[in-house]
Design a protein with these regions (language model features):
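Intrinsically disordered, low-complexity acidic Ser/Thr-rich regulatory segments
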Residues: 1-59, 69, 118-126
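Forkhead-associated
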Residues: 34-110
Length: 126
């Protein structure tokens, strides 16, 4: 599936919704336990030492591996032509839509996205 340039373009008009908190957490791999609450609509993920917003300690992850773009009603994952690929639902993808508790893999690192309404103080509602 082709992905709009707007996901990678920093001036795309993407915006975080004010009624939800979106978090990406490492659930398996050497960076296990790392949690990052998204504070902007375009967030890059890559290997430690690179210029990515979220840095993963995994040699199989490219310095700029993928980007997560957020609109009001959608969270999008887009591979940035990484060497080892981005995987969602056990398939290598160029792009994928993520929902609450969607898991994806970069190298040997597994991550999960959580989308929680802001009026909940924690994620125990699910």
């Amino acid at each position: 599936m082709a992905w709009p340039d707007s996901v990678m373009n920093k001036k795309s008009g993407l915006s975080l919704p004010d009624d939800r908190t979106i978090t990406i957490s490492v659930i398996a791999g050497s960076s296990n336990g790392l949690t990052h609450q998204l504070t902007k609509a375009r967030t890059s993920i890559g290997r430690t030492g690179g210029s990515a917003d979220i840095k993963i300690d995994d040699e199989q992850v490219s310095p700029l591996h993928c980007v997560v773009g957020v609109t009001y009603d959608m969270v999008r994952l887009c591979d940035l032509d990484s060497a080892n690929g981005t995987y969602a639902n056990e398939e290598r993808v160029q792009a994928a839509e993520l929902e609450h508790l969607s898991e994806f893999r970069l190298g040997s690192t597994w991550l999960v996205v959580t989308i929680v309404p802001r009026h909940f103080k924690d994620s125990t509602w699910f």
